[in-house]
């Protein structure tokens, strides 16, 4: 998946891809971030699964010392992995901003290039009218999260002249992912 997002190490001749460097194909610019984000998410899922099974066992009366030890292990894993996932996600976002600014603009519903860009919590992106209807925004927060500066500039979708992903699916998929993570 990371190669499809940030393809490197190939040449294109008459519509056919030819690998020039397998090293670059595999270890492309987004590979370490996507791998770490997905691997950590898998471990975090396992931690919650462990806690869920332990809770189920405790509710069924099988609450010996082993059940609570496993529950504590799952809770400790989650306590370490959840903040780590936020940090890895931030690094992944910075990498995506560098290599796929149109995707970031679609994820955030940013139409015009702006500094101090607001974070859109909710809204309905409209590609025809180039706006996000009923948007609930937090001023400056998108710039702070994505550039680590209140006055950071985010390129808007209008900069990409149609060369961007469909906005609504990307906008909503990102919110679903964050919602599940929260």
Residue ranges of model-derived segments:
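Polytopic transmembrane helical bundles with strong interfacial aromatic enrichment
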Residues: 1-182
